[in-house]
């Protein structure tokens, strides 16, 4: 069996045709599976042969990692099996996933590993299917999620330096690991599980602030019983700084770049090269264009990886969805939010559909597999349902009695510092600040990320991080000043994570005079809130309405609900909740124009639809069989066809 190594490649002896794929048992990924390796002693290891060429072994057998990323927390639990089977049927042998601390411990000391967050069930399902698993537990993960996966309550203490050996941060990490790692231990390879490697932190080379931090985390994993191969993950500029003794250094990249491999090989010439992230596409941001990457480029790059004997993981194989408020953001002179869809232009679409990339890769992998690839799992059908007439509504200020008890404070605090949720503050959503004012003037308020300002129930303007001053007109008597602030997703990388508190910061003043005596409402939009809202006195919705409001309607899904995509014509900005589940944000600045609605989240027949729209009421909600992730169509019409399909160009 011919194996090609990078030093050979770089000296000009790379294979020049796909004939190398025709040799029997070309790749070990199809031979070594969790069900076939019963007697386990060694696990995933690295070796060098007599010529000094390094390679991976699994239980002593040469092994190539052919991995794909699927994040369990971005996929409905009912579809985990479908996505993993499609990964295997494409020819992959390994699934990788991040573990989001901020979702598992939203409140300090209160852990959630249920439903879509059931990590153990996900890993065991992968084992049953026949896949190996690489876990990436952070504590920081980036992943384009809010605060890079760090819980927002860490921001309550301004002296807590994130991603360092700062006492407050490390104590929190230790308590989290004390709860998380025992769940991982029995899932490890040497204990009969499918986990063959565990990553230490994530891309620390681009952040590096504390030379002791990575070593501390490595020891934290080891002393709690992690026995499988440890690795780090950075781009070419960060591999040196982000590495740690005792862990394999892996690299992240957008394309096949010789310089990157040479740099990594010089660092650890006795170790095999592993591409921990080969980016199959990229994430989208609100107000930007939808990003795509050609299927042929992906196929050609993966062909090179395999020809050169490189193990790799494709990020993402299946991106899924940023359900709820979990999306992250970035900063480029202003805050930019990641969109709801995490389609990523990945190998498998957001809804789990096959793509051109999938079929090209499957053909490539099949040509070198020692056995036939599994048959393709069937596609999940999509449906078009009757339009949803949102016939009832409640203006924002009418729902205040259905929220949790408000907080009364002398001066406002950020959402993280609200004295709620057992001292953990508010992680996601919106906050409404109210106080009485008796004169107009120049209002100053430092808001993050965006705010609508009202006098009583009348909108008077907006604020954001770059616009902190608003002129309030002269008023008669005293009136209620209301400031509705939304967290649009905390920045998920860079030094800015340290100061990502949301809500109202610092003082609020009019003409320099400090405003006091605030009533503060938490709008975290949890399921319990929507249950209470069912008892509200909903009003008949007018044809048009300006301002933030909740709208109610019914989606009839028939007797056998299945997937669909929601299209919200003439709605501007808000969130959609189906039976109390938050599908995520919509925004008319694009590029995303539809929201993915998984069939398992629908009941037979009637389903409650609630839309929280911040700006202006739109028309009936429509459903489609295909998503619209960008602005234009092949037809140029900008409209779906008669079947409800809309193929973006």
UniProtKB/Swiss-Prot annotation:
Keyword Cytoplasm listed: no
Active site: 203 (proton donor), 277 (nucleophile)
Stored Pfam families: BetaGal_ABD_1, BetaGal_gal-bd, Glyco_hydro_35
Record GO terms (molecular function): beta-galactosidase activity
Disulphide bridges: none
Record flagged with keyword Hydrolase: yes
Any GO BP annotation: carbohydrate metabolic process
EC number(s) on file: 3.2.1.-
Top-level taxon in the UniProt lineage: Eukaryota
Keywords: Glycosidase, Hydrolase
UniProt xrefs under InterPro entries: B-gal_1-like (IPR026283), BetaGal1-like_ABD1 (IPR048912), BetaGal_gal-bd (IPR048913), Galactose-bd-like_sf (IPR008979), Gly_Hdrlase_35_cat (IPR031330), Glyco_hydro_35_CS (IPR019801), Glycoside_Hdrlase_35 (IPR001944), Glycoside_hydrolase_SF (IPR017853)
Family: Belongs to the glycosyl hydrolase 35 family.
Name this polypeptide is given: Beta-galactosidase-1-like protein 3
Organism: Mus musculus (Mouse)
């Amino acid at each position: 069996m011919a194996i090609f190594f990078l030093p050979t490649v770089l000296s000009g002896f790379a294979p020049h045709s796909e004939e190398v794929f025709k040799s029997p048992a070309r790749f070990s990924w199809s031979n070594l599976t969790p069900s076939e390796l019963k007697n386990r002693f060694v696990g995933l290891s690295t070796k060098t042969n007599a010529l000094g060429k390094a390679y991976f072994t699994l239980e002593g057998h040469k092994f190539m990692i052919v991995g794909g990323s699927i994040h369990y927390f971005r996929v409905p639990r009912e579809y985990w099996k479908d996505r993993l089977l499609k990964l295997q049927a494409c020819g992959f042998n390994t699934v990788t996933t991040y573990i989001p601390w901020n979702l598992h411990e939203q409140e300090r000391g209160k852990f959630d590993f249920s439903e879509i967050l059931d990590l153990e069930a996900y890993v065991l399902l992968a084992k049953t299917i026949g896949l190996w698993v690489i876990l990436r537990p952070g504590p920081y993960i980036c992943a384009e999620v809010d605060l890079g996966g760090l819980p927002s309550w860490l921001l309550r203490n301004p002296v807590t330096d994130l991603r360092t050996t700062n006492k407050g941060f490390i104590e929190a990490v230790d308590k989290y690991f004390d709860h998380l790692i025992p769940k991982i231990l029995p899932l490890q390879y040497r204990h009969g599980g499918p986990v063959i490697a565990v990553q230490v932190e994530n891309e620390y080379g681009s952040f590096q602030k504390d030379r002791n931090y990575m070593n501390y985390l490595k020891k934290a994993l080891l002393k709690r019983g992690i026995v499988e191969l440890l690795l780090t993950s950075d781009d070419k500029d960060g591999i040196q700084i982000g590495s740690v003794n005792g862990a394999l250094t892996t690299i992240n990249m957008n394309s096949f770049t010789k310089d990157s491999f040479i740099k990594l090989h010089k660092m650890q010439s006795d170790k095999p090269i592993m591409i921990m992230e080969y980016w199959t596409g990229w994430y989208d941001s609100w107000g930007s264009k939808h990003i795509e990457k050609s299927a042929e480029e992906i196929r050609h790059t993966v062909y090179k990886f395999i020809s050169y004997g490189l193990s790799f993981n494709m990020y993402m194989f299946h991106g899924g969805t940023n359900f709820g408020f979990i999306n992250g953001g970035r900063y480029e002179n202003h805050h930019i939010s990641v969109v709801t869809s995490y389609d990523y232009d990945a190998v498998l679409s957001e809804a789990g559909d096959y793509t051109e990339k999938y079929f090209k890769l499957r053909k490539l992998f099949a040509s070198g597999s020692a056995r036939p690839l599994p048959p393709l799992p069937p596609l999940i059908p999509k449906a078009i349902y009757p339009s949803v007439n949102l016939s009832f509504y409640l203006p924002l200020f009418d729902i205040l009695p259905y929220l949790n008890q408000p907080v009364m404070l002398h001066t406002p605090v950020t959402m993280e510092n609200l004295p709620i949720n057992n001292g953990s503050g508010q992680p996601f959503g919106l906050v409404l600040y109210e106080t009485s004012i008796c004169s107009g003037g120049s209002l100053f308020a430092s808001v993050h990320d965006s705010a609508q300002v009202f006098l009583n129930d009348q909108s008077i303007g907006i604020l954001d991080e770059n616009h902190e001053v608003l002129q309030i007109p002269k008023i008669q008597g005293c009136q209620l000043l209301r400031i509705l602030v939304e967290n649009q997703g905390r920045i998920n990388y860079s030094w800015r994570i340290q100061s990502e508190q949301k809500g109202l910061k610092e003082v609020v003043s009019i003409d320099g005079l400090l405003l006091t005596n605030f009533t503060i409402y938490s709008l975290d939009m949890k399921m319990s809130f929507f249950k209470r809202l069912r008892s509200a006195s909903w009003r008949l919705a007018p044809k048009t309405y300006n301002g933030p409001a909740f709208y109610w309607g019914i989606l009839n899904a028939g007797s056998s609900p299945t997937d669909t995509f929601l299209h919200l014509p003439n709605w501007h900005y808000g969130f959609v909740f189906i039976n109390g589940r938050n599908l995520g944000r919509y925004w008319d600045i694009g590029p995303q124009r539809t929201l993915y609605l998984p069939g398992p989240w629908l009941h037979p027949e009637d389903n409650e639809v609630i839309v929280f729209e911040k700006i202006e009421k739109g028309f009936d909600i429509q459903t489609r069989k295909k998503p619209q992730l960008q602005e234009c169509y092949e037809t140029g019409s900008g409209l779906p066809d008669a079947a409800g399909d809309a193929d973006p160009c």
